[in-house]
């Protein structure tokens, strides 16, 4: 293992034309989402028949269960809008215990030429946190950029993956964005569950290949930030055993949720502190032995709040539960994260869901903001160190954006996403190099 320190001399800028596409599309999508914040999309929010799985779910992971044409937000730097047709997709994946389950997502086929080297690839995107309610599913907000509902109560969810989807579509790649298990479809969304999120990403790649009429030899890359960064990191390390046939070339795991315990401690009392409820609810769904232990330490208000959060979207926790401190949910005023750390019943769950225990077989770029106030820098760096110690090929880049309004998430968590994902020296370059067959060098820690 060769671990280096300092900037990687092999990093290069994207070609000017590709940089222009990436920057223009990212800005246009962000502006479009801002414009539609005044619009309501009741139809998009209603799960409807499409999101209801059949009585018998095909057992084979990656099986396409059904598709449905869908429109896409057209506010892009082109009169033609998006360069490919899009579909809602439902496909088979596996729960933590191996049981088949239906998961939905968005598939965007490519129409224009592939602007990178080699054959046209598939890009599977692990989305960032959208919430835990069915209406929070990312696929329900691709038409408008945002979903606003008023029944039974006001709710808001934005599609954070419009920029990434649009950029890769403009470059000529096929794109699949998974909704994850339990978002849109029945059951609890198992937020930050390493195993189930990895399954959804890997089986999404299998389903995308089927829709494209291509085989597993199709070049594949993973892209994700925050919750999505953790999801694709987990997918990268599980791919050799779970989906060895896939031709994975590389992964960008930006600001990855790798150590759930560290995340719970960091966001407690922050603007999106309510996301702790997503994590607790997901744990209880897969580790029922935890329920009695959590009930013992939570007050009635705490239990009611956790139940309400199970149907909330990311916008809701900002408007209804801003800067939530979980000490307000417990009998003794101690944070829920501290209680979890002390519970013998929680130890297996927190260990199971930690990313970094396996070894990815293909190169991974990890980026993290030193001053990220939502997903701690140290646990992202630890993931890189863990993988490097196992002989993986990893590049770790530190984003030095200074602290701006600490605890409010947007500057110091989403700022590095835009810089590292779409800036002049970015994750797109890294993945294009992998698709072009350029070798990555050992372990580089920046």
Region annotations inferred by a language model:
Residues 362-363, 376-387:
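Short alpha-helix in the alpha/beta-hydrolase fold that links the catalytic acid
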Residues 257-357:
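Accessory cap/linker subdomain of secreted extracellular hydrolases
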Residues 206-276:
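Primarily recognizes the serine-hydrolase "nucleophile elbow" in alpha/beta-hydrolase
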Residues 360, 365-372:
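Short beta-strand/loop motif that positions the catalytic acidic residue
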Residues 347-348, 389-446:
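C-terminal catalytic histidine-bearing segment of alpha/beta-hydrolase fold enzymes
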Residues 170, 191-212:
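Alpha/beta-hydrolase active-site loop
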Residues 96-104, 108-171:
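Short, surface-exposed "cap/lid" segments of acyl-processing enzymes
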Residues 39-114, 118:
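Catalytic-loop region of hydrolases
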């Amino acid at each position: 293992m060769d671990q280096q320190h300092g900037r990687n001399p092999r990093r290069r800028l994207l070609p000017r034309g590709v940089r222009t596409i990436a920057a223009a599309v990212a800005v246009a999508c962000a502006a479009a989402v801002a414009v539609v914040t005044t619009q309501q999309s009741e139809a998009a929010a209603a799960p409807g028949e499409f999101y209801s799985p059949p009585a018998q779910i095909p057992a084979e992971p990656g099986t396409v269960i059904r598709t449905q044409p869908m429109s896409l937000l057209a506010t892009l730097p082109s009169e033609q809008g998006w360069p490919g047709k899009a579909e809602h997709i439902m496909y088979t994946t596996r729960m933590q215990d191996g049981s088949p389950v239906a998961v939905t997502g968005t598939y965007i086929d490519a129409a224009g030429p592939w602007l990178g080297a080699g054959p046209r690839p598939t890009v599977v995107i692990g989305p960032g946190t959208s919430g835990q309610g069915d209406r929070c599913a990312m696929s329900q907000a691709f038409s408008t950029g945002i979903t606003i509902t008023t029944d039974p109560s006001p709710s808001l969810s934005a599609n954070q993956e419009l920029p990434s989807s649009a950029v890769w579509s403009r470059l000529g790649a096929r794109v699949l964005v998974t909704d994850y298990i339990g978002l849109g479809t029945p059951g609890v969304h198992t937020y930050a569950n390493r195993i189930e999120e990895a399954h959804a990403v890997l089986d999404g790649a299998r389903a995308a290949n089927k829709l494209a009429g291509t085989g597993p030899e199709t070049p594949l890359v993973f892209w994700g930030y925050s919750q999505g960064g953790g999801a694709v990191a987990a997918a990268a390390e599980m791919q050799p055993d779970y989906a060895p046939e896939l031709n994975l070339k590389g992964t960008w795991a930006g600001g990855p949720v790798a150590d759930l315990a560290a995340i719970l401690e960091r966001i407690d009392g922050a603007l999106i502190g309510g996301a702790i409820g997503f994590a607790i609810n997901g744990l209880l769904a897969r580790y029922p032995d935890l329920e009695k232990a959590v009930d013992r330490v939570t007050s009635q208000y705490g239990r009611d709040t956790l139940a309400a959060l199970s149907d909330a979207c990311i916008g809701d926790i900002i408007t209804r539960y801003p800067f939530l401190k979980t000490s307000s949910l417990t009998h003794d005023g101690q944070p829920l994260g501290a209680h979890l750390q002390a519970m013998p019943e929680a130890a297996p769950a927190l260990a199971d869901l930690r990313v970094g225990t396996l070894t990815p077989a293909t190169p991974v770029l990890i980026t993290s903001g030193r001053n990220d106030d939502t997903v701690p820098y140290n646990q992202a760096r630890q993931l890189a160190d863990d993988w490097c110690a196992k002989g993986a090929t990893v590049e770790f880049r530190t984003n030095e954006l200074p602290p701006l309004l600490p605890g409010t998430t947007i500057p110091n968590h989403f700022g590095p996403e835009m810089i590292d994902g779409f800036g002049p020296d970015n994750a797109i370059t890294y993945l294009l190099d992998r698709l072009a067959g350029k070798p990555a060098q050992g372990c580089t820690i920046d």
